[in-house]
């Protein structure tokens, strides 16, 4: 939905991989000053969980973030060449391998390839006209969406040159407007409706 809105888009590192925050970094390996603030000491871990080096290659010691061994030059003399490189500044959990770029790159259904397709469509379909028109299917479902009891619903809007974004936050599948589906973030229901927490981009008929 964010990429369908007017204006610039901001993608935080790892978002394009579907990478979760690393919430269990040991206290003695944190770097964020928030974790060591006298008022919050060992109460709030700060932002380091979102700053862990990205996984590029699943089968390497640092998931491709840095070389496995040192190479001569740039502060490394011949006697150090071949030694193991230092660990990354923040620890990478083993489950990072499941989100590595080289794995997602070859998976047509991965989050990485979804982002690539969305960015390509954004470039193709978005114009300088920032007009956004709410569609009739933009509505509250009147039912909790599962997120702390909030009422869910559908957010749907039309962009200037005839395409629309529909996101279903409601508990029940939502009907889609007529048109050709350009992109969908997850499978539709058997009868073609949009499930909860799923977005579709549609070239309106």
Roles of regions detected by a PLM:
Residues 1-163:
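Loop/helix patches that line or flank the sugar-binding groove of alpha-linked glycan CAZymes
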Residues 169-205:
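C-terminal beta-sandwich/jelly-roll accessory domains of carbohydrate-active enzymes
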Residues 164-168:
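Buried hydrophobic-core signal for structured, non-transmembrane domains
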């Amino acid at each position: 939905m964010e990429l369908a809105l007017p204006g610039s888009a901001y993608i935080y590192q790892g978002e394009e991989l579907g990478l979760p925050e690393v919430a269990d970094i040991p206290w003695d390996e944190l770097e964020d000053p928030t974790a060591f603030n006298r008022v919050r000491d060992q109460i709030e871990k700060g932002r380091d969980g979102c700053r862990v080096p990205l996984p590029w290659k699943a089968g390497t010691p640092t998931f491709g973030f840095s070389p496995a061994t040192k190479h001569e030059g740039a502060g490394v003399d011949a006697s150090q060449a071949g030694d193991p490189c230092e660990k990354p500044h923040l620890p990478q959990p083993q489950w990072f391998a499941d989100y590595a770029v080289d794995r997602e790159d070859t998976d047509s259904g991965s989050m990485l390839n979804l982002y690539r397709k969305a960015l390509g469509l954004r470039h193709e379909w978005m114009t300088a006209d920032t007009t956004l028109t709410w569609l009739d299917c933009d509505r509250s479902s009147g039912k909790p969406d599962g997120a702390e009891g909030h009422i869910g619903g559908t957010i749907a809007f039309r962009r200037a040159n005839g395409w629309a974004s529909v996101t279903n936050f409601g508990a029940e599948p939502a009907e889609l407007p007529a048109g050709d589906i350009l992109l969908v973030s997850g499978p539709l229901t058997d009868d073609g409706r949009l499930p909860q927490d799923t977005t579709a981009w549609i070239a309106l008929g």
